[in-house]
């Protein structure tokens, strides 16, 4: 019997689609790909998630790379405006409220930089969570098994009583490999169906 639902943030609770963001801003495939590699696909972005580099340090390195690639305008625009992507997925939050009202405990497990985590903590839906782990706080990232076990131990969760929801297949698979039921999030409708398959009705 499931008691705990564990949520990723980006792509699940808040919108996060860097490639769409870049396409909307530049509409130039080469510029989009090069900017993606310098920013979202970079080692610095991974280090931000892991909490081992500051935003200022990461931005400095990214802009140095941008100068070599002649992409300073694109990268600076991206660094200035990417936060606007992080709009709350209101339908997912509605599902979360229904789950909470039905007695399920909600947790988060997210790869996220410190400054983004600080901002999301201020959103009204954050109080729905009973606990969770942010990668920047423990210097671990999904899909590493250690971040899952850290969450389960810290929050005293039973593996067979927990469902993990993520928009990244590798992360959902990592949870499954540890004995946690994994749901690959695509949209609220498919998420609701997947919950139903687990015996959880939220309609």
Tell what function each PLM region has.
Residues 159-196:
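Acidic, Mg2+-coordinating phosphoryl-transfer loop and its flanking beta/alpha structural elements
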Residues 1-41, 193:
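Active-site neighborhood of HAD-like aspartate-dependent phosphohydrolases
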Residues 46-78:
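A metal-dependent, Asp-based hydrolase signature
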Residues 93-101, 152, 172, 176:
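Surface-exposed amphipathic alpha-helices with a cationic face
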Residues 8-11, 51, 99, 108, ...:
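Generic structural signal for small/hydrophobic residues in well-ordered secondary structure
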Residues 4, 141-169:
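Conserved Lys-Pro-Asp/Glu-containing loop-to-beta segment of HAD-superfamily phosphomonoesterases
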Residues 73-107, 145:
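Short, acidic loop-to-helix structural element flanking the phosphoryl-transfer center
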Residues 122-136, 200:
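Structural recognition of alpha->loop->beta junctions
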